[in-house]
Amino acid sequence: MIKPLLIEIGVEELPAIPLLKELKNIEKKYADILEKNSLLCEFEFYYTPRRLVIWHREFKTQQDDSTEEFFGAPLEVAYKDGKATPAAEGFAKKCGVTMDAIGSAQKGGKEVLYYKKEVAGKPSIELIGDIVDTWIKSLDFGKSMRWGSLSESFIRPIRWVNILFGDESVDVELFGVKSAKKTFVHRISNFNSVSINGAKEYFEVLKAGGVTLFPELRRESILNNFSLLEKENGIKIECDEDLLDEVIAITEHPTAVLGSFDEEFLKLPPEVIITSMKEHQRYFPVFKDGKLINKFVVVSNALTDDFSK
């Protein structure tokens, strides 16, 4: 059987650069843990500054059955005068069986003691908690921090954990936070937690609450805003890809807004102005007729259409 599985780890705002540096490893680390638990299957990973999300459209309710092979001492060591030696008896004890169940197999050019154990798969719900715990603690964002009385550390404090296997909440405690059927939407939409009845409902709740969960949709929205601003104002926005990745990582509801600064600053070399805008304000420089002008574009995370103030 299969069910959808949603894993959401809610955090205080993640810094963009450490997140982007670890981004290439996040999915691989999770996949490796699934494979180790005989539960590897397709999944999608999403992120916003306030959440890390794993989504399985289909996740097995039971581990695959597996086999374990055990190899012991060569037969000439395992038996003496037709009787099992302490080496053979120790091997059987290690395998949890009597000598009657022990066979032999070729290994390294010798006939050695051999035992093959059939292992029944466990229910997935019993493993999900450890999988999530191992995955989160494997992530390396560089610097980390402690909070409260915890001895463990993470890049930012974890504020909620939401793990839904179908309509069932999976009991997990991560960094002192217990899982619950709730999430948080955009702060301007609702500062309080919002209940979630099932995994599939999650995406509808976020969308209604002003959160664009998918990074590729945030990118598309920003670029569409850029095109509109360029057409309306006869300008050209310099779209730096690294800066674009950063603003995608720090917004849940991005809107590009055109601003301006005092023309006096244009007396400075353009390189100085552009570097300052990009590195210190996360602004996108604006050009007209090939020249830098006293305008910039900032990507806002505000849930509003009124940027007049």
Regions found by a protein language model. Name each.
Residues 297-305:
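Short beta-strand-to-loop transition segments that serve as allosteric relay/switch motifs
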Residues 1-282, 291, 302:
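Long, basic N-terminal domains or extensions that often function
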Residues 308-309:
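Switch/coupling subdomain of P-loop NTPase systems
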Residues 285-286:
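Acidic, Ser/Thr/Gly/Pro-rich low-complexity segments that form flexible
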